[in-house]
Amino acid sequence: MTDHRLLLDTHVALWLDSGDERLRPSTRASIDGCWKSDGTIFLSAVTAWEIALLVDTGRIDLDIPVDAWIRRFLERPGIEAVSLGHEAAARSYQLHHLEHRDPTDRLLIATAIELGCPLVTYDERIARFGARHGRQYKFAVAA
């Protein structure tokens, strides 16, 4: 899927930054296609928070402090920070009543809905949510 605007899930942002092989060629092509079309790749404040939490709990290691990593990532051409809006925060609570209960993922789903762009993720629960409710919520998953 090639779109002119994409929101990255946390693991995708980390894999993109590190050149991780888990980032499939088709996903890389979608991201590259977005860049080549002068599109925008969004990094959510929720993702920045989750990365900080993962570092703090020892689940991941970065080569530089979290705030420096985020600044470096956002300095790439075509990458834009997106704040958590009030509408997305409220919508994420509404998603609580569905089968997807992870609050971080619900916030990212709601942000993608608010932005009107696909969420690039390999999270199977998010993909299932997209398959079941994508039309209703105008939500798409790209991976």
Report each predicted region and the residues it spans.
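Acidic, PIN/NYN-like endoribonuclease modules and their adjacent C-terminal/linker elements
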Residues: M1, I109-A143
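Short, well-structured N-terminal submotif of metal-dependent ribonuclease cores
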Residues: M1-L43, T57-R72, A142-A143
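A secondary-structure boundary/capping signal
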Residues: D9-T10, T47, Y122
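A generic structural signal for short hydrophobic patches within well-formed alpha-helices
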Residues: A13, A48, A89, I126-A127
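Residues that scaffold the ATP/ADP-binding catalytic core of kinase and kinase-like folds
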Residues: W15-D17, L54, R91-L95, F129-G130
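General small-molecule cofactor/ligand-binding pocket signal
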Residues: F42, V82, K138-A140
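Phosphate/NTP-binding elements of NTP-utilizing enzymes
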Residues: I51
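Active-site neighborhoods of divalent-metal-dependent phosphate/nucleic-acid chemistry enzymes
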Residues: D63, R76-E124
